[in-house]
Every structure is written in structure tokens, then in C-alpha cells.
């Protein structure tokens, strides 16, 4: 099938140039100042937000690294719905992290690599990188892996000690919320790059979870206590992976979906184990997998008109990762109204979808499908001293 052939060609690594950096950074700064209701200037009780992981949270770090357009979204039509220009976010507008910052009365959290005044980093920092995984080997050399994101966080922690002093910095680190989305690329990359696993699926999941466990313990040692997690969505049902289905039918890519399920079971077990064994460790886990499947199965129930096809892309389900025409495949189609779609491109979601997810993550027990969040919601975590 031609779509599958194109997708295999598209899967990784082309040279790109940076687009709209200065303009986009200015818009982001102004948007952050205007949209958030800042009420804690000089407030010692401010709760900061730190973000780690992949494209579900990356607000533009990949704009500033030597990578390819497969891992960048700094060209139109990305960003068209909210910012009016591309910002590096893999969506038509805002991400979950942007909405959470707004609900917490914080400015838009700046990417770690964004040039500018370090004072902007005193309410939190976004370390996430599109394409990143818990494994160093995942798209190695083209993304900022979780281990490097941790190194960047340690630099900010030193900056905080300089700005606030040792004791005040320690209090702020402890009060901060750490939101993490990681794992999707560790599994989807196997299929997108046509690899074969040298180990069993369960062993692969164990290594991913092991690296994530080490990361959490490192943040905890520095002083972090309040963590939020997005689990891995049903990857096999994403348009980019569905077109790789060898049966040439409309089903999801079974092994990709299976890896996501295995990861999520292991992640849930890990977090509840840590809650029992690690003093002061508190967490919120968002079942992104279930939430996305509900919307794909019943799009109209959640205000969508299209539950499977992407808004932007090429081929069946617009599953070829061609949105914007800056990747290997230059031709692409763009829907009229992204708000009607769950998927923005073949691997990412629309602002409308992220907005719904952010509401669930923040409000927890007040939504119709609230069982997807627990044992705390993110609002609860922000309220804990």
C-alpha cells in the first residue's frame, strides 16, 4: 500500500531550518503574561510547575537543537488556532501543560532552551522534547532524552539556590509539581523505524520503567514530592501506526497497542508501590489511554465530528506525517476546523483534545469520565503545602 511505503520513508531524519523563532518567542511571552492571572509576584507560597517528557508537553525546546523537521513543529500550520504562528508545539494551539499553567495562575512555562531572561524560569521550566523517550537510544542524537532533561533540571535547581537561597529554594522545590509524559516514543519508534526488538516486549517495558524509576528517585532526592503522570495512549490506533497494519484493514496496530498496555500496567504498579514505600511521595496518574479511546469510539459525545482521521496529513486517516510540507512528503491536506478533530497530525492531538484532557487532569472527580484520574488530581497537588 502506498501510504505504508510513504510512512516508512517519512519515519525519521531530514535536515531542517529554524522558522519564526524570534516572532514566536515574543508571542509566547505576551500570551503567557496576558492569559495567566498572576497573583503571586513575590509570594513565597508560589507553586511552580516543571514539565518533562515528549511532544505531548514540549513547548518548543526542539526549536533550539540540531534535529530534523520530523522532531520540530516550528512551521505552519502548527500553532494556527491559538498563537497564530508556529511555536514548536506539535498541535494547532496549546498543549496540556499550557492549560495546567493557566489553571494554576502561572505564566506559560518557558522551554529550558529558550533564550531570554532567567527570571522567566522562576515559576517553572519546560524540559520536554518531542521524540524523547526514557531510553537514551530512542531517536538518539535528534532529541533531548529524559536523562539529559534531568541534567537541565539540576541546572535550574542551582539557579534557584542562587536566586532564593538554599532554604527557600528547598521549600519551593518541595512545593513544585512535576508533570511527566514519557514512554510513547520508546514504543512507537520500534514500528516507525521498522526495527525488530532484540529482547522480549516485557523486557523492553521493564527497561523503560526502570529508567523512569531512576528519574523519579533523582527528582525525589533533590526535593520533589508531588508528581503528575500521563500514561501512554493506545499507540496502535494513532493514524501513523494504523497505516503500518500489515493486514491492510482498518484495525489498530496490535503490538503497538499491546506495548502501551503493558507499560501502563507497570507504571501504575510502580507509582502505587512508591506511594507505599517512599515518604511524602504523592502522585496523580491520568489515564490518557482510556480517555483517548473513549473519544475515538464516541467522538460526538465529546463534541468531535471525526475520531480517527487526523486534521493535517496525507493518505488514509491522513496517517502520513507530512503536515506543513516541510518533511519528506511535501503534499498534505488540512481540515477546515481542527476543533472537530481529535488528532491534529498523524501522531499528535488538537488543542481541543488537550483542553479536555487538561480539564480532567486538573479537576479529577468533577467530570463524567473522572475515573481516569487518581489518586490525586493536579489541582489537589498544587494545594498541598
Curated annotation (Swiss-Prot):
An example GO BP is: lipid catabolic process
**Residues glycosylated per entry:** 45, 66, 194, 211, 289
Tell me yes or no: is Glycoprotein among this UniProt entry's keywords. Answer: yes
Keywords from the UniProt entry: Glycoprotein, Hydrolase, Lipid degradation, Lipid metabolism, Secreted, Signal
GO cellular component term of the entry, any: extracellular region
Q: Which residue positions does the secretion signal occupy?
A: 1-35
Mind telling me which Pfam families this protein's record contains? Lipase_GDSL
Q: MF terms per GO, please?
A: lipase activity
What EC class is this? hydrolase
**EC nos:** 3.1.1.-
Active-site residues annotated for this sequence = 55 (nucleophile), 345, 348
Q: Where in the cell is it found?
A: Secreted
* Entry annotated with the keyword Chaperone: no
Q: What PANTHER family does this protein's entry cite?
A: GDSL ESTERASE_LIPASE 5, GDSL-LIKE LIPASE/ACYLHYDROLASE
Q: Which family does it belong to?
A: Belongs to the 'GDSL' lipolytic enzyme family.
Its protein name is: GDSL esterase/lipase 5
Gene source species: Arabidopsis thaliana (Mouse-ear cress)
